[in-house]
Amino acid sequence: MTNNSQAVPAIALAGVNLSLGHGAARVHILKDIDLHIGTGEAIGLVGPSGSGKSTLLMVMAGLERADTGSVAVAGRNLSNLDEDALARFRGRHIGIVFQSFHLIPTMTALENVAVPLELAGEMDAHARAREELAAVGLSERLD
């Protein structure tokens, strides 16, 4: 077994704070969050409704900026990126699957799988989509 303790974490948050609102209505959503998620590691994020889970995920994806602290993905500090660079970085390195996602009903299974690959710049998205559908036993459902 190798020691990966020195490896760059897939996601690293250090001292992350986020408040929303103004003045007396200001609410502290995230308070001094430190979190390291290693490559290939899976975690569960649980808590009651309104506890900041979705907000934390938005900060981790660079869709919401923390007030203080740092957020790094694949060793890249997101706070150092302007909006255009952040959008490009997200397109290459960050994916989000929302709780209620749906396939596009007017598209085939092949097209539904190929579209995000095309958006990510995959050269032969349809061939890759066929491979991925075959890998999960859905070759017969391409059309």
Regions found by a protein language model. Name each.
Residues 46-48:
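The feature captures the beta-strand-to-loop junction immediately N-terminal to the Walker
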Residues 61:
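Helix-to-loop junction immediately C-terminal to a conserved catalytic motif
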Residues 24-27, 78-95, 119:
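ABC ATPase NBD coupling module
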Residues 76-77, 124-141:
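Conserved ABC ATPase "signature" region
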Residues 6-10, 19-32:
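A short, flexible loop at the N-terminus of ABC-type nucleotide-binding domains that lies
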Residues 69-77:
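Conserved ABC transporter NBD signature motif
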